[in-house]
């Protein structure tokens, strides 16, 4: 049965009639007892209404009229005294001071008299106490609901006991029952001062109890009655569950409507307090992400379950399923529902562990789908546009060293449409959020129109395939559910954990004893061990020394993963078979890489020394020549952009562009020379990509005037200088030991290999900020130590500004001044943003500058991968990983380790690694 309250304006109440049960004794718990204090007359005339707890009443009357009038009087027995200290008896009345009882008198040989106890509403769990049944007393009673007699065999005996633990035992009460009534009697003599009692309860709801009494002995001419709230925890454990939902479609059903998550749901009785069957107070719970709530392990009866929306003008679902015809419908209207819960009651079913909603319930029975539908008067909707770097359709925000962290996409235009009407028009901010607050609710719903930026596609489009790149996207948007829009273009995309391609230099000529040494290799970017300690096959040998010789620049074609490398002049490592003008291509065929000549600038220009003359000395047994040509012939860095390969022809100081699809389509561009006073000293080498445009880095080497220190420049192809990089900052110790420090300050370019000679070798963007890798040319002039620098330049909204004192863009780095290992000044104004020190405790020595000669920021990563040396051993080629957020050195991946038995197996500390690039593929084909 469900009754709808209509006098509550703002609360949604589900009223489930139960009891306020406060104390536990074995498997029975007890609540309020009926107060008989108003029964003062020895004779009962008309009905008397008596209070039962705070909010219920019970009516006491004579069922037989004037012809048989019972004699009754209130009897409040003090608890805890000698005559009333039995613990089970005390538990029935909880922490009350008195046992509230009614005395019913009957003289020997007098006709029996009867009383009737009647409630206005059904009572679900109540216990009837009858005491002082002795000396041949005879008591009978029966019950009914709405005039229909109860099967009295359904009543349970809970306790047969006595009032006192200290007095002599009372007589034993005999119980006899059939379908129509229960009879009580006593045929034993006991201590008249120690009263006996029996406590019973019905298993079905009742509203009337008739009790009749007759005495057969003048020594016992009264019995006592008590009525108390109670519950049988072994048979009457219930749960209430349901959903709170936004009734967006006015359907009064939670199906296809969004849930209300995080909503506090309250439960109470009319007197305001609820206890579960473990005696714990229960008053509220919170809906989960599905809008689901439940109250577990409570006794059957009458409750109120409600929510209090923050908006007092909240409207509710228009229809109510008062007969529980549809399990998914709204069960509340005008603020409340009333339902009775008991075994076999309407909607009450056994708990089923195969039902997902019942999994956490410990009760025996449950009434499910007590659903509450809310109609939003004005609704607000919002969404988030983000850069989905790995295109997995999810916004990944977890910070790890080897995965992308998706970022908000600002500047995206979004419109809100009601059918064809534009309701709002907004632009996403720095947080990527677009919001439409306080728009009228419409039953047809709204559409968010995403004006996709050029070149981008949506990665989580709900109905694949997604619209083409740059096309407008229409998406359904609903309240209380953030619409996530993942966008990606090819430039920003990279699959999870891509392979990394890197150059490892081999000794001697390409056709000499190290011809088969690997030069171009790939390894997993998420490697957690040194490569030489990883299982066979983890590192792939793509091209050998005999195939490509000495190369530096590496470029990866995102379309198919082909890798391009360009010739490089390095001491004791000869050019490949096609000489100084060669660009090689390594491609996968039948799961195997094959390498061939892709482009020869010397041949293309019909001039065999256009890229410089090979100045190596062959055979290259113990000596090599031509060191003065390092950085001046062959090629520099290499990048691929928009279907073309770019590199720098060092001999002519030109930018070379070659079409990937047709190498006959190539072009040479003059590069602006910023070295006004000594134009011959201009040494461009590095390339990068900023805002979709090629940028170039180089140094004025000062080799024409060795008294000065080189200066670096970063510029656009147009010659617009983005950044000037003075190289006169302190650099700590190039090498240090127990008591020595070899100064690391930069010098002008020369043929003196042990001097540190700055060479801007790579440009890497981290968002709007730039990372400048500075290779030590001295490490390529001989087999001696090369020590590298790495500078960060932060964009202030107008220009790039170099780090200073280890701080960039207001963010402190890892090496504030002084940053040298022994406290020596190191870096611009004596501090460095990135920690590039190395200390080897075994030998008590190290270097203050072993940073990166080539830097990689995989799209979306917060880390910088750099080709470097020495992470935990001496003479070790290493890929180091730094945190771009704070400059901390996180870890290193050893690529090679110099062998004491065979020191010529690699270049050790002498610039043994070259360029490095991730193998990222295009997402948009």
Swiss-Prot record:
GO terms for cellular component: extracellular region. It is found in: Secreted. Residues 1-26 form the signal peptide. InterPro entries: Ig-like_fold. Glycans are attached at residues 47, 95, 142, 166, 283, 334, 344, 378, 401, 511, 642. Keywords: Glycoprotein, Secreted, Signal. SUPFAM superfamilies: Hypothetical protein PA1324 (SSF117074). PANTHER family: COLOSSIN-B-RELATED (PTHR36108:SF13). Belongs to the serine-aspartate repeat-containing protein (SDr) family. This is Colossin-D. The lineage of its organism: Eukaryota, Amoebozoa, Evosea, Eumycetozoa, Dictyostelia. The gene is colD.
